[in-house]
Each structure stands twice: as structure tokens, then as C-alpha cells.
Curated annotation (Swiss-Prot):
Heme c binds at residues 14, 17-18, 80. It comes from the Eukaryota. The gene is CYC1. Pfam families: Cytochrom_C. Belongs to the cytochrome c family. This is Cytochrome c. It comes from Candida glabrata (strain ATCC 2001 / BCRC 20586 / JCM 3761 / NBRC 0622 / NRRL Y-65 / CBS 138) (Yeast). Keywords: Electron transport, Heme, Iron, Metal-binding, Methylation, Mitochondrion, Respiratory chain, Transport. The modification N6,N6,N6-trimethyllysine is found at residue 72.
Amino acid sequence: MSEKKGATLFKTRCLQCHTVEKGGPNKVGPNLHGIFGRKSGQAAGYSYTDANIKKNVTWDEDNMSDYLTNPKKYIPGTKMAFGGLKKEKDRKDLIAYLKKATSD
């Protein structure tokens, strides 16, 4: 896994809609700080779809990988417009970056 490659993926595929820093703003998508260990649909100040709230999953590496493979399949009704990362290596790299960038 490569955090560096994950950071590049985040900048090119995620940054237009998400922030990762503590206290960062919600954009089109929610701020992701503290995402691991948090339940879906629970970022403060972000207006989620009922689908995200009702999924009621606690984010970890495994289910985040499943979600990033095909977000609309994992949570039908999500407003995340991202089509997904099909390559497992890309998902692992992105998750390695997110684990570091979204923690305290």
C-alpha cells in the first residue's frame, strides 16, 4: 500500500467534493475527518440522504473498500456521484492515505 499514491488519488478523484482535515468544511460531500469508526451518515453539519443514514455501517477498511468499489451499489440512494475505484490496489492506497489524513 502506498499513502503517497493514495494522496494523489484523493487529490484527483475526491478533493473536488471532500476535505480531510480536522474542522475542514463540508463541500458537495462531507468532511471525512474521523471517518473510520464513525457510522455512515453522521458527519456534523452535512445533509445526508436517508439511504446513507439508514445504512448504519461503522466505517472500517473492509467496508470502505466495498463502498469505494461501487458507491451506488453499496448504498443505493447515495448522492455520491463518484463511479468507484475498480482496482483493489487503488482502493488500498486511498484507504491507507485516508486512515492517516483523517485521524488526529
